[in-house]
C-alpha cells in the first residue's frame, strides 16, 4: 500500500476513535515511521491495541495535558493518559525548545503510554543540531538478574547526535536481547524466535514466541543489561512520577487501567562545549570506519545508518502489509 494512502487510513481510524486531527496525524506519522524503518513490532501491529484501549476508555482521546515549568530548562508534563505518541511529541518538542533557548533541556513525562520508537523522537532533536538522550519504561518482560520473575520492561536506551552528514547517529536499543514487539509479531505469525532470547514459564530456553510471551525475556549482557534496565526504570518511572517496579500494565492483555508510563527527554546543543563539534564527530566516525574489517564486512556502520538507508529505500516502495494487518485495518475502518 502506498505510504500516503496508508497514512490517510490510519488518520481516519484514529479520528473515528475520537482523536483530534492533529493528534491523529502525530500518531499516524509515528506508526508509519516504524514501518518504514522496519520496526514492525512498533508499527501497524499495534494499531488495533491502541483503538481497543481508547474504546475501553483507558487511553484518553481528548486529554487535558498539563505542562509545569520547573526552570528555564526543565519541564514536567502530565499527559492525562493520552495516547503515548502525543505525549512524547510534546515532550521532545518542549525539550528541543529549552535546549535551543538555554543550551540544554530536560522534560519528564508521566501518565503516558507506549509511544513507539525512541529513535523517532531523538531524530527530531538531531535535526536541530542537538544531542538527545531518551528513556522510557515498559510492562514487565525481563527478570532482574538473579530473580525468577519478570519485572523490568524492555526499557530502551536511546542516544542521538548530529554527524555532520545527512545520516544521524541514533542508538535506540532495548535492554533485552530483542524487543518485545518482535516476539509479539512472531507469535501472531506463528514464527519462531532466535535461541538465547527468552525462557518459558518453567524457566527453560524456548524458540516458541507464544511460550516466550508467557515466560521471561533475557537481558543483554547478563547482570549488566539488568542494571541498565533498572537505571531506565528509575529515570523514566521513579523520577517522573510514572509507574515503575513492574507496575506498568501490558497494553495488549491488561485493560484494568492506564499504563502510566514515564518518559525522560534530555537534549542539549551539540556545540555546547566544542564549537567545532561537527568536525570532531566527522573525524570520530571517519577514524572508526577506516579500521580493518572482518572478512565479509563491506562497511563498518554506526548506529542508525541501517535504519536510515532502509527508510529511504522503503519510502520509494509501497508498504507491505500482512493479511492479518489488512483485516485489522478493514475492521477498524468499518467498525
Predicted regions and their residues:
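Acidic, glycine/proline-rich low-complexity segments that act as flexible tails and inter-domain linkers
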Residues: 1, 12-27, 32, 40-58, ...
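Generic N-terminal amphipathic, Lys/Arg-enriched alpha-helix
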Residues: 1-17, 264-266, 309-313
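Active-site cofactor/substrate anionic-group-binding motifs, chiefly glycine-
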Residues: 43-99
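A generic, well-ordered mixed alpha/beta core segment in the N-terminal half of proteins
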Residues: 75-164
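Phosphate/diphosphate-binding glycine-rich loops and adjacent basic-rich segments that engage nucleotide
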Residues: 142-210
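Small-residue-enriched flexible segments
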Residues: 180-241, 258
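Catalytic-core signal marking the mid-to-C-terminal active-site face
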Residues: 239, 244-335
Amino acid at each position: 500500500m502506498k505510504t500516503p494512502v496508508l497514512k490517510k487510513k490510519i488518520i481516519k481510524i484514529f479520528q473515528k476513535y475520537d482523536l483530534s486531527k492533529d493528534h491523529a496525524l502525530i500518531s499516524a506519522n509515528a506508526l508509519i515511521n516504524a514501518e518504514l524503518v522496519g520496526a514492525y513490532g512498533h508499527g501497524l501491529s499495534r494499531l488495533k491495541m491502541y483503538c481497543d484501549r481508547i474504546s475501553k476508555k483507558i487511553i484518553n482521546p481528548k486529554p487535558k495535558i498539563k505542562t509545569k515549568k520547573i526552570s528555564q530548562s526543565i519541564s514536567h508534563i502530565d499527559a492525562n493518559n493520552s495516547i503515548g505518541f502525543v505525549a512524547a511529541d510534546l515532550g521532545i518538542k518542549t525539550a528541543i525548545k529549552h535546549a535551543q533557548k538555554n543550551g540544554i533541556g530536560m522534560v519528564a513525562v508521566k501518565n503516558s503510554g507506549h509511544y513507539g520508537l525512541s529513535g523517532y523522537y531523538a531524530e527530531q532533536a538531531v535535526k536541530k543540531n542537538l544531542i538527545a538522550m531518551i528513556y522510557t519504561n515498559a510492562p514487565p518482560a525481563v527478570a532482574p538478574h538473579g530473580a525468577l520473575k519478570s519485572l523490568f520492561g524492555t526499557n530502551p536506551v536511546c542516544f542521538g547526535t548530529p554527524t555532520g552528514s545527512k545520516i544521524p547517529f541514533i542508538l535506540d536499543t532495548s535492554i533485552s536481547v530483542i524487543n518485545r514487539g518482535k516476539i509479539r509479531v512472531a507469535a501472531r505469525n506463528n514464527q519462531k524466535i532466535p535461541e538465547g532470547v527468552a525462557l518459558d514459564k518453567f524457566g527453560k530456553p524456548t524458540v516458541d514466541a507464544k511460550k516466550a510471551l508467557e515466560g521471561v525475556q533475557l537481558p543483554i549482557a547478563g547482570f549488566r543489561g539488568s542494571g541498565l534496565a533498572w537505571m531506565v526504570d528509575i529515570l523514566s518511572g521513579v523520577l517522573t512520577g510514572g509507574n515503575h517496579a513492574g507496575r506498568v500494565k501490558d497494553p495488549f492483555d491488561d485493560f484494568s487501567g492506564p499504563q502510566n508510563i514515564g518518559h525522560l527527554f534530555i537534549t542539549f546543543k551539540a556545540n555546547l562545549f566544542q564549537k567545532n563539534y561537527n568536525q570532531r564527530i566527522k573525524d570520530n566516525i571517519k577514524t572508526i570506519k577506516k579500521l580493518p574489517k572482518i572478512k565479509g564486512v563491506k562497511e563498518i556502520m554506526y548506529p542508525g545508518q541501517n535504519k536510515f538507508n532502509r527508510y529511504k529505500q522503503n519510502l520509494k516502495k509501497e508498504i507491505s502489509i500482512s493479511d492479518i494487518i489488512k483485516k485489522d485495518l478493514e475492521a477498524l475502518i468499518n467498525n
